Amino acid sequence: MATQEQKIIFRKIEDVLYSYKKYVDKIKDDLKELENPQIAKRYSIDKLTGSGYVIVKSELERIEELKERLLNDITRHEEILFRIDNALEMIKDNKDYNFIEMRYFNKLSYEEIADKIGVEVRTTYRIRNNILSALEIHFKTQKLI
């Protein structure tokens, strides 16, 4: 049985794994947004105030600022995915590796996983604990938790 500290760590690892697809989708959405010709009209940053002045930015400046922000978001999300992929690569030879895909990427229930691999439901919980234990050091090394 996992200790309270292990449960907290496992929960953090699971949160990162469940978020993987969200990062992939966000990158795709941001890339589409960068290619959108209506980009300037969708985001209005007309005036900035400071030191008693009102600065009105041109449409080109607004577009460039928005593109820069989107590119920064894409870069940040790609970095997170890269670190997750590196951690997963370290355990890919683990006999229970396919549990990660079934549970966290395909969102199968423990019952569905048990049926799929032909084990008792309680065994899937043991498999989860084993695979998350194997991932723990790699997630810490990659500064994901």
Language model features: what each stretch is:
Residues 124-135:
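DNA major-groove recognition helices of helix-turn-helix
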Residues 92-106:
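Short amphipathic alpha helix immediately N-terminal
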Residues 88, 92-95, 123:
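Short coil/turn residues that cap or connect secondary-structure elements
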Residues 1-90, 137-145:
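N-terminal interaction/assembly modules
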Residues 80-83, 94-96, 127:
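N-terminal positioning helix adjacent to the helix-turn-helix/winged-helix DNA-binding module
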